[in-house]
Amino acid sequence: SDLSASQNTEYLQSIGAVIHFGHHEAHIDNAEVVVYSSAVKPNENPETMAAQEHGIPIIRRAEMLAEISRLNYTLAIAGTHGKTTTTSLCGLVLMKGGIDPTVIVGGRLNGLGGTNARLGKGEWTVVEADEYDRSFLQLFPTIAIINNIEAEHLDIYGTAEEVQKAFIEFSSKVPFYGFVAVGLDDAGIRSMLPHINKKVVTFGLSRQCDIRAIDIIPHERSTEFTVIAHGEKLGVVHLNIPGEYNVKNALASITVGLHLGIPFATIAESLKEFGGVYRRFEIKGMNNDILIVDDYAHHPTELKSALSAARSGWKERRIVAVFQPHTYTRTRDFYKEFGLSFDDADIVLITDVYAAREQKIEGVSGELIAQAAKNAGHRHVHYVPNLADIESKVRGLMQAGDLVITLGAGDITKLSDSLLSAE
């Protein structure tokens, strides 16, 4: 059940799932187990409360993911940024490599027909390991990937140090015959390295990495680079998504693929065929010579990465960035950092906060970020608090030859669809 219809519920209904809108105790009739997400408070929800009364097991979604994945060897992809794309890349590499994995991703993967999962017959399960609410600590990965570590979800962890402790605990769950693959370019990873007591394999752009990329050439919709593994030049990869940050995501999948014995040529072919992930630098299309892009970025580092990819690939286009902050706590904790994230955008529009699971915090709004961007020296920042007004404002500013990118984890994606379809 869910509170309202969405693309996800519509898809599930199309393949035969029975979906209830709203929560009611009658919905659990004949259920053998009730699984709830981190958005649900089990002591307040009528379905979980009824399950408890009737002796039906209730478990968190993260626990169900752990139960599914422990049936196989598990490749778990963690990190503050890049989890969904890296999980998708790893899944594709293993699929092309003949391993036939089960794949469970936190986003809709174009290569899986727009779904977020596939059931394989092989011995490996590839899962996205979310650190929110410490969910990833339910998993017992055979191989763990940690792309990067930054302060995030401080409403849960409180401090950056507590975030790092959780990732250290996650790495400790890897058995002696597995390994932890880490993105060595990241400062958070480097400070964590002395505390990892498992085998470590490093990837990134640094010369100190076990698996690294050199000669990176950005194109509009793709990126070309050469792979060096343990000092040996393996060859060139044509990655079918833009952005240097995606090169690092791809290196994680290359690291795992090589370890599992997949030929480099097969790995490179997989990355060339990668169809992307819903809302991860998703190029929606062109309208009157205006390129429309949509991205899930909702952390300062993610904004910088997405806008850098736009600038690297489309140097001649003016970039119009439309950002919807996600959650009041994140806005409160990082508004100054957000203000420093828009240098690659020519024009910035910021709307009010998408609350998600949170209650409004007095004095916290998108205006904090807009003012921080102005204070940091950005010359063209517009605060448009009402999302209903944002489309007309964008239309008044954009012109032929622009790249318009919508950014955020809320419902700002609807704007990209409107801009694409309008005459």
Language-model segments: residues:
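Structural beta-sheet core signal
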Residues: V103, A144, V182, T202, ...
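Nucleotide phosphate-binding/pyrophosphate-handling subdomain across enzymes
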Residues: H219-R221, A229-I347, Q371
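N-terminal leader/targeting and accessory segments in enzymes
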Residues: S1-R60, M64, L234, P242
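Short internal beta-strands
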Residues: S1-L3, F179-L184, V320-F323, D344-A355
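C-terminal helical cap/extension that packs against the catalytic core
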Residues: G339-A400
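Beta-strand->loop->alpha-helix junctions that form or flank phosphate-binding loops
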Residues: D2-S4, H20-H23, I59-E63, I104-G106, ...
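A glycine-rich beta-strand to alpha-helix segment
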Residues: D389-L420
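Phosphate-binding loop of NTP-binding sites
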Residues: H27-D29, S38-L184, G188-K199, L251, ...
